[in-house]
């Protein structure tokens, strides 16, 4: 009797100890991962997300950084630095070349990231959010005398070295230009054509006129010279100093001056180009008494438009500048009865000629073909 009771106790104890092993592999792995990543203090007690909000008065140079930089930062952090400088100054941020956080998911920084926001009395604007290791964030200058930096890490993966941001203030603050732009008449000459360069005094230049003028320029330098001949070099330097105010989810990567020039050149080079076009063979060859297999073929034909690369684009058409004929082998059928055996006289492999456009030109009525 005592042996039977002892056996029952052993069976029950063994079953109770291992009943958790019947959980699904997925739930077991998730549970183990979460338990392994719970934040604990020095006494091994579980703690919540660590939060800290710090105000910094910017009177010179300094820096903020992720904890333990340049080593791996801790998990479960939410740190905020609010930087303030004196009136009529701005704050400039520069990231250390050592930068690395947890990688993005589908190009979105969801988990570990550092974020910079412009702060004013009326609004808060996100200047950028960064993570991963591929890109060192660019230099940032605040729009006002306040800026906010936020660092967040979740309870899973961490990375190193983290980040370090150097801050300083910029003197001689000038308010941003008003939304209503005026224009000052300044004459400059490009390609023998005179234009009025926009500044801040004359309100006669319309958007259509400005758009037409911009079509003349091939480089960013020429465009900025047109806007402000006296200060275009400073404008060029400042143009690539600040990041955009808002980055959408589909943001690609910041373009340099060379990239912008290349994009503009690509538009002019490829807007009117030969491209694949499918043609119906009966319609193309104007044959009504035959059919072909395949019914359609791909040929190179001019396509696109001239609207972004030339002046007076409304009078321009994209036309072939060089046409060649190429042979294609197809199966041709002619109406009639088909024999089930033997050679059918009304079916044969034939060579046909189709026009292919090798070069395309923008033909404008206001000027001869280029």
UniProtKB/Swiss-Prot annotation:
GO biological process: cellular response to amino acid stimulus; cellular response to hydrogen peroxide; cellular response to platelet-derived growth factor stimulus; cellular response to transforming growth factor beta stimulus; platelet-derived growth factor receptor signaling pathway; positive regulation of cell division; positive regulation of cell migration; positive regulation of cell population proliferation
PTMs per UniProt: Activated by proteolytic cleavage. Proteolytic removal of the N-terminal CUB domain releasing the core domain is necessary for unmasking the receptor-binding epitopes of the core domain. Cleavage after Arg-247 or Arg-249 by urokinase plasminogen activator gives rise to the active form.
Disulfide bonding pattern of the chain: 109-131, 302-360, 306-362
Annotated site location: Cleavage: 247-250
Superkingdom, natural source: Eukaryota
Family annotation (PROSITE patterns): CUB (PS01180), PDGF_2 (PS50278)
GO molecular function, one term: platelet-derived growth factor receptor binding
Pfam families: CUB (PF00431), PDGF (PF00341)
Localization per Swiss-Prot or TrEMBL: Secreted
Signal peptide: 1-23
Keywords: Cleavage on pair of basic residues, Developmental protein, Disulfide bond, Glycoprotein, Growth factor, Mitogen, Secreted, Signal
GO CC terms, sorted: extracellular space; membrane
Residue span(s) of domain CUB: 52-170
Glycan-linked positions: 276
Role description: Growth factor that plays an essential role in the regulation of embryonic development, cell proliferation, cell migration, survival and chemotaxis. Potent mitogen for cells of mesenchymal origin. Plays an important role in wound healing. Induces macrophage recruitment, increased interstitial pressure, and blood vessel maturation during angiogenesis. May play an important role in control of lens epithelial cell proliferation. Can initiate events that lead to a mesangial proliferative glomerulonephritis, including influx of monocytes and macrophages and production of extracellular matrix.
Family: Belongs to the PDGF/VEGF growth factor family.
Subunit structure: Homodimer; disulfide-linked. Interacts with PDGFRB homodimers, and with heterodimers formed by PDGFRA and PDGFRB.
Official protein name in the record: Platelet-derived growth factor D
Species this protein is from: Rattus norvegicus
Source lineage: Eukaryota, Metazoa, Chordata, Craniata, Vertebrata
